[in-house]
Amino acid sequence: MNNGYYAVALDKESCNVVKRNATMDVVVGNHITLAYKPNNKTFEKLNKLCGKKVDVYIKEKRANKNIEAFWLNGMYLTETYKKLKRVDKGPAHITISHKKGFKSGDANTMFKNPTYKQDLQTEMEYLQGKIKWIIN
């Protein structure tokens, strides 16, 4: 097992767009986790994509009283427009912000029964980032 994770690290402009939507204490909004502590096969597969640009499309903003996130409509490699999928369980998302005492990973529990849901497919342009290996 590899101690780190692959993510789409959002560029500065995209981070700013995400952070402008934050309403809670701890603002995150800088990446989309693809694979956390991946096995060797997944590590090698995603390692070949490091540095590649990705276009990210937002479907909805979902939230509960503790955390809020953008739920994604899709991620595509900019160069080839090949679809990029999250390897880990749960929907691909960008944690926007959360209350103190919670962590970004708690967003996974919120997607099934959010108390707030807003469709953003026609309102938001796409975000951009690059695939990156991040060491814990």
Regions found by a protein language model. Give the residues of each.
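Histidine-dependent nucleotide/RNA phosphoesterase domain, centered on the 2H-phosphoesterase fold
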Residues: M1-N136
